Amino acid sequence: MPFTLGQRWISDTESELGLGTVVALDARMVTLLFPAIGENRLYSRNDSPITRVMFNPGDTITSHEGWQLHVDKVNEENGLLSYTGTRLDTQEANVTLREVLLDSKLVFSKPQDRLFAGQIDRMDRFALRYRARKFQSEQYRMPWSGLRGQRTSLIPHQLNIAHDVGRRHAPRVLLADEVGLGKTIEAGMILHQQLLSGAAERVLIVVPETLQHQWLVEMLRRFNLRFSLFDDERYAEAQHDAYNPFETEQLVICSLDFVRRSKQRLEHLCDAEWDLMVVDEAHHLVWSEEAPSREYQAIEQLAERVPGILLLTATPEQLGMESHFARLRLLDPNRFHDFAQFVEEQQNYRPVADAVALLLAGNTLSDSELNTLGDLIGEQDIEPLLQAANSDREDAQAARQELVSMLMDRHGTSRVLFRNTRNGVKGFPKRELHTIRLPLPTQYQTAIKVSGIMGARKTAEERARDMLYPEQIYQEFEGDTGTWWNFDPRVEWLMGYLTSHRSQKVLVICAKAATALQLEQVLREREGIRAAVFHEGMSIIERDRAAAWFAEEDTGAQVLLCSEIGSEGRNFQFASNLVMFDLPFNPDLLEQRIGRLDRIGQAHDIQIHVPYLEKTAQSVLVRWYHEGLDAFEHTCPTGRTVYDSVHDELINYLAAPESTDGFDDLIKSCRQQHDALKAQLEQGRDRLLEIHSNGGEKAQALAESIEEQDDDTSLIAFSMNLFDIVGINQDDRGENLIVLTPSDHMLVPDFPGLPEDGCTITFERDVALSREDAQFITWEHPLIRNGLDLILSGDTGSSTISLLKNKALPVGTLLLELIYVVEAQAPKQLQLNRFLPATPVRLLLDKNGNNLAGQVEFESFNRQLSAVNRHTGSKLVNAVQQDVHAILQQGEAQIAKAALGLIDAARNEADEKLTAELSRLEALKAVNPNIRDDELAAIESNRQQVMDALAQAGWRLDALRLIVVTHQ
């Protein structure tokens, strides 16, 4: 094309330069000025990587003064173009804009503009863009979206609770599963769903101080949720950045004590507009009608301001009706306002629970039982269901299930309370205790005597704590020269046990980090035993490495030495041998230690070894735990209650372990109290609540569906394709592990979610569960989600040219592959993606406007095509520009019908689902006061907004590929 001064051109290789203007010419060279960056570039007149910028009628262009023109007509005179049309800001018609006055910062964003401007992408990027659109749209439509991405086993009762609660508007529930059933995981799954769907954006987690790191680790490791820990130091630091320090982060963890201590801090927390709050160990919130505790009042203040609340507690309601009521009162103060009325209501649920038990037993129902059911579900005609349930017909079981669902919907606290018990959930191992009684060394005896004389002023509790750890008493007197491990018989026993069980993995837990470190050194130096250490002084990454080394089967560590705090939040189901080098001070911590191995998914019975020194507090405690509470071999929900009731007596025995007069009687009375409480718990088991929390067959089916999805290989193929194109190196390490590292030629210099030093990934859930250092890649992982956003939010792959070698078609035949996106714009919290995610529609048009997409599948067609370099591609485009415009117009006419079909289907689905949910809850509200007015109002408002947003849905061209037939 001949050059003329004043013409506008664009660089094919440096599109960021904007529009260039021809400012000088000679026989062989042309000089372009790029005003946007104030630089000149020199190009050869022949075959340079630059493209003439020419707009067409229908385009909107911008002048260098900033106003826009809708082009009606294009004129050419002496090689220069001028555009005539309507000025958009003043609506003035027949305005002419010469090309030299076009805005130099022009960015081509429409696929067709990029194609005509010579901004042609690689063919593989176009294919990746289409796949990304397709997969993203499919993933949003999955019914279990938000439940697959976590690094957890697929346990039905957990999935059931998370699926039910995670989809609610601002859920306010009490999760009260027994110890070891995974309340933290359930809460994490609910958070993950709410954050992923946009229903929540700001989350606050309030936990006891000792559990802060456990939550931090669990949220990051299992759910890829990066929380910030707020303590006094962090709070003070953030005050420099914002008036309200809590507004500097979206996801925050802090301790209950931190919340309670300062009035100003509590006010800042209340003002920070959280969407969801999680409170762990909610049984620590003490309440009575006359005197609620400071902690309770602080959480109550927050609960009034935060729409969604998850309270977690392992304490069953039978051990304290009043405190159970207090927790429910936090969730819904209007519903739970009178304790006496609540107690009466609870007693009225007994006939409902009995009715459920009857239906589940499968026996024939008597007339009086049928009448009772009729009375309980009185507001609608259930006669046909009752007849079916009482017959031998095939649908009898289904009818009984439906009646159970109706009863559960209508009665009890089933919408606000979930509680699974070990009795109701199968799959737990047995626990076997082995106690090893060892003599107290003379060195310890002397140290204890001296300590008793010197510590006469200490309280009984301080002396009791000292007596639990004689090695520390000895070390205090001896200083750095003390080597307690040389004579402590527990060390000898441990070495003997480990050397005689070399093929077995053993978890050793002790109270203090120093003990763990000293034991590691002794085991390594004396016996060459491979031991990993795990304590609170290590970073999360160091702990991951230690855990991964312990998890390796052949070359890994035989033993993992953990301190009390260091082991929080970590589970090692692959090991079944637990050694307690010392004992913790209270039953909760004991259960927490055993809980590291005693989880669902543990394949073997757990062997618990307790080597203890006689005449120390350990010998007292081991008997009290085992004989008084049966706390080693069974979970002990009564432990805390019994411990609190005998606290002072027990402390005195621990402080002076040689004086055991009356200790047998104490053990006996504790055992009686424990048995009575346990019987009370068993008798008061709320079968109704357990059935509802467990989820039954529905939960099982959900777990199986997700497991099936785990086996889908399309994610692996897509991920590898994505990593290749983004420029991420992949190194296959075997055992289903791949190491990803950034390369020097990345699509973006800093890929979000990929650390500078890389990371190890796996696509296998089982591998991810046993290897804590490997990230579990699913469609919900930040690496994949960020990759999809990176490709789809920019123009990567939005315009390309390919050659089709096909002798059945004439040379030069044109095809245009158009990828349209049908979408609706709306705030994220409306979760429009459930009904109409950005959905790609593919058209493959020939010159006559025939759509061949139905006959020609994308992947097989893509394999037949070959790439064209950018320079040749630009020439091809210029030669067929008019034809492409004509085909594009035919595409616009055809997409409307397909898009409107998708939009109508989405509107019908949304209307049906949201109206059905609203009607169901409105009908139930008449008989179940646990349905909140604000929840109904939110569903109605949400339905209206969703319908309005879908009415505004539209479509746009997202990507196109020009295909030219060749015979070579």
UniProtKB/Swiss-Prot annotation:
Gene Ontology terms, MF aspect: ATP binding; DNA binding; helicase activity; hydrolase activity, acting on acid anhydrides
Subunit structure: Interacts with the RNAP. Has a higher affinity for the core RNAP than for the holoenzyme. Its ATPase activity is stimulated by binding to RNAP.
Domain Helicase ATP-binding: 164-334
Listed EC numbers: 3.6.4.-
GO biological process assignments: regulation of DNA-templated transcription
Record-listed ATP binding positions: 177-184
InterPro entries xref list: Helicase_ATP-bd, Helicase_C-like, Helicase_RapA, P-loop_NTPase, RapA_C, SNF2-like_sf, SNF2/RAD54-like_C, SNF2_N
Pfam family of the protein (one): Helicase_C
Gene3D superfamilies, alphabetized: 2.30.30.140, 2.30.30.930, 3.30.360.80, 6.10.140.1500, 6.10.140.2230, P-loop containing nucleotide triphosphate hydrolases, Tandem AAA-ATPase domain
Keyword flag Transcription: yes
Family matches, as PANTHER family: DNA ANNEALING HELICASE AND ENDONUCLEASE ZRANB3 FAMILY MEMBER, SWI_SNF-RELATED MATRIX-ASSOCIATED ACTIN-DEPENDENT REGULATOR OF CHROMATIN SUBFAMILY A-LIKE PROTEIN 1
UniProt KW keywords: Activator, ATP-binding, DNA-binding, Helicase, Hydrolase, Nucleotide-binding, Transcription, Transcription regulation
Function: Transcription regulator that activates transcription by stimulating RNA polymerase (RNAP) recycling in case of stress conditions such as supercoiled DNA or high salt concentrations. Probably acts by releasing the RNAP, when it is trapped or immobilized on tightly supercoiled DNA. Does not activate transcription on linear DNA. Probably not involved in DNA repair.
Ranges spanned by the short sequence motif DEAH box, renumbered to the chain: 280-283
Family annotation (CDD domains): DEXDc_RapA, SF2_C_SNF
Domain Helicase C-terminal: from-to ranges: 490-644
Organism domain of life: Bacteria
Protein's name in the database: RNA polymerase-associated protein RapA
